[in-house]
Amino acid sequence: MEQFHGTTIVSVRRGDKVALGGDGQVTLGNIVMKGGAKKVRRIYNGKVMVGFAGGTADAFSLLDRFEAKLEKHQGNLTRAAVELAKDWRTDRMLRRLEAMLIAADATTTLVITGNGDVLDPEGGICAIGSGGAYAQAAAKALADNTELSPREIVEKSLEIAGDMCIYTNHNRVIETIE
C-alpha cells in the first residue's frame, strides 16, 4: 500500500514574532488526492502552532499525543516535546509512525523528528517535508537579506518551494504569534 506523503512546512522566528506555514497538497504515489489540506493548526487554546509532514494518519496520531502532552505539562512546549519523543522511542507502535512535527509558541520553536529527536532550530528557521530544503534555504536567504516579517518570509518560502517541489502546491495556511 502506498503512503500519503509530500508537503512543506516552514517556520520563521524573528524577534518576538513567529510564523508557521504549510502547503495544502496530499499525494498518494503520483496522484494528487487533495489540494486544500490543512497541515498547520493551533492547539492548546491557540497558544501553540503545529505543522506536520509525513503519513497523514501517522501525523494526526502524533498530533493527538502531542496535544495530550501539552495539556499534561500545562503548555510547556519543550517538556511536552521531550515527553512525546520519549514515548516515540519506547512505544513499539509509535516507532512505526512516519511523520514529523514543527511546534512553536511565543518563545520556542521545536522540530520533532520521526526518530524521536527534539531539535531547537538554529537561527529560528526550520522546515520539514519534501519541499523543506527549498523552503528553508529561501527563508534563510530572505531573513539574512531583507527586513520582511516572519509571515512574509514564510509566505515567500512556501511559494518558492511550491515552484520547485512536485509534492508542494500553492494553497497555503499560515499562522502567526506576535
From Swiss-Prot:
Tell me which Gene Ontology terms the entry assigns under biological process: proteolysis involved in protein catabolic process
UniProt cross-references to Gene3D superfamilies, sorted A to Z: Glutamine Phosphoribosylpyrophosphate, subunit 1, domain 1
Entry's localization field: Cytoplasm
Which Enzyme Commission number(s) are listed? 3.4.25.2
Disulfide cross-links: none
Listed InterPro entries: ATP-dep_Prtase_HsIV_su, Ntn_hydrolases_N, Proteasome_sua/b, Proteasome_suB-type
Q: What GO molecular function annotations does the UniProt record carry, in alphabetical order?
A: metal ion binding; threonine-type endopeptidase activity
Q: Which GO terms describe its cellular component?
A: HslUV protease complex; proteasome core complex
Broadest EC class assigned to this enzyme: hydrolase
Q: Which CDD domains match?
A: protease_HslV
Q: Which reaction does it catalyse?
A: ATP-dependent cleavage of peptide bonds with broad specificity
Any one Pfam family here would be Proteasome
- Show the active-site residues: 7
Keywords, sorted A to Z: Allosteric enzyme, Cytoplasm, Hydrolase, Metal-binding, Protease, Sodium, Threonine protease
Organism's domain of life? Answer: Bacteria
Indicate how activity is controlled. Allosterically activated by HslU binding.
| UniProt-annotated binding residues for Na(+) | 162, 165, 168
Main localisation: cytoplasm
The protein's role, per its UniProt record: Protease subunit of a proteasome-like degradation complex believed to be a general protein degrading machinery.
Q: Which family does the record assign?
A: Belongs to the peptidase T1B family. HslV subfamily.
Its subunit composition reads:
A double ring-shaped homohexamer of HslV is capped on each side by a ring-shaped HslU homohexamer. The assembly of the HslU/HslV complex is dependent on binding of ATP.
Q: What protein name does the entry list?
A: ATP-dependent protease subunit HslV
Please report the organism this UniProt entry assigns to the protein: Paraburkholderia xenovorans (strain LB400)
